[in-house]
Amino acid sequence: MPITLDPEKLAIVMKHKFQYKICRECGARNPPDAEKCRRCRSRNLRPKKFKKK
């Protein structure tokens, strides 16, 4: 069953795949509310890029 047909499942997938931050220095994935990178302790974080089709 495709996930795109069920809006509840789609919301769960979108949350887990796109709601996090990426460190610009080491590329580590961090929680969406992070202020510092868990790996290198840098404050240079960006939200995960997402293009909607």
UniProtKB/Swiss-Prot annotation:
PANTHER family: 50S RIBOSOMAL PROTEIN L40E, LARGE RIBOSOMAL SUBUNIT PROTEIN EL40
Name of the protein described by the UniProt record: Large ribosomal subunit protein eL40
Coiled-coil intervals: none
HAMAP family referenced in this protein's UniProt entry, alphabetically: Ribosomal_eL40 (MF_00788)
This protein's UniProt keywords: Ribonucleoprotein, Ribosomal protein
Record keyword Ribonucleoprotein present: yes
Record organism: Pyrobaculum islandicum (strain DSM 4184 / JCM 9189 / GEO3)
One cellular component term from this protein's GO annotations in UniProt: ribosome
Single GO biological process annotation from the record: translation
MF (Gene Ontology): structural constituent of ribosome
SMART domains on file: Ribosomal_L40e
Domain of life: Archaea
Family classification: Belongs to the eukaryotic ribosomal protein eL40 family.
InterPro entries listed in its UniProt record: Ribosomal_eL40_arc (IPR023657), Ribosomal_eL40_dom (IPR001975), Ribosomal_eL40_sf (IPR038587), Ribosomal_zn-bd (IPR011332)
